[in-house]
Amino acid sequence: AQQLLADCAMALGGQPLRCVVNNASQFEPDTAATAQAQGLQAHWQTNTATPLLLGNGLLAWAQQHPSPAPGWFSVLHILDQKVHNLNPDYFSYTVSKLALERSVALQAQALAPWVRVCGISPGLMFLSGPQTQDNFDRASRVNLLQAPIDPAQVAASAVFVAETAALNGCTLPVDNGQHLVPLGRDVMFAIETTLHGAGAQEPPL
């Protein structure tokens, strides 16, 4: 982690490194009934362990580079609105993101007072897995605003959290209210049923 952070600092060309955004995710289909050890471990490594270790790396960095003000350094874990709105699809992915979401407050307590830790849980922004464009166009409106989520607003929210020192140990949904629209399946599968009926085949996985 320290070498990666040093490389990031060098890439910034002299600008101070103050925030790590953990956005990488593994997203493979399975259910609780079909999950295998290899898939569970792979999702855990990418979606949970690596973000937490990078946060610990920023702690060591912050302790070596005095900040101009309290709360200056921060770690942002990019989650998923699904952690607030569960369904049984993409089980290994969901479990790994739930673990990371539960870790936000714990890591914030452990890294204080040097580093703040927050989560951001966006909704559907891009084509997901085997999703078709028609399916996405409909699924992206399954939220309280009935409108697609603008990725630029998610990015702006990350900047806001990084610059607001009073925010710590919390998770901010940025999803047009998608987490308040419960579904029994992943939104892609729910829309597929709407388009083609209850007997429709799911998109190939």
Language-model-detected regions and their locations in the chain:
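Amphipathic alpha-helical dimer-interface segment in Rossmann-like NAD(P)H-dependent oxidoreductases
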Residues: 9-13, 46-70, 108-109, 113, ...
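Rossmann-fold scaffold of SDR-type NAD(P)-dependent oxidoreductases
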Residues: 15-25, 47, 77, 118-122
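Conserved mid-core segment of classical short-chain dehydrogenase/reductases
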Residues: 19, 25-43, 64-71, 89-92, ...
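Catalytic Tyr-X3-Lys loop
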Residues: 26, 33-53, 76, 93, ...
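Catalytic loop of short-chain dehydrogenase/reductase
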Residues: 49, 63-112, 124, 178
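Conserved Rossmann-fold SDR core element
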Residues: 101, 111-125, 167-174
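Catalytic Tyr-x(3-8)-Lys segment
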Residues: 135-153
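C-terminal substrate-recognition "lid" of short-chain dehydrogenase/reductases
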Residues: 148, 152-174, 179-180, 185-186
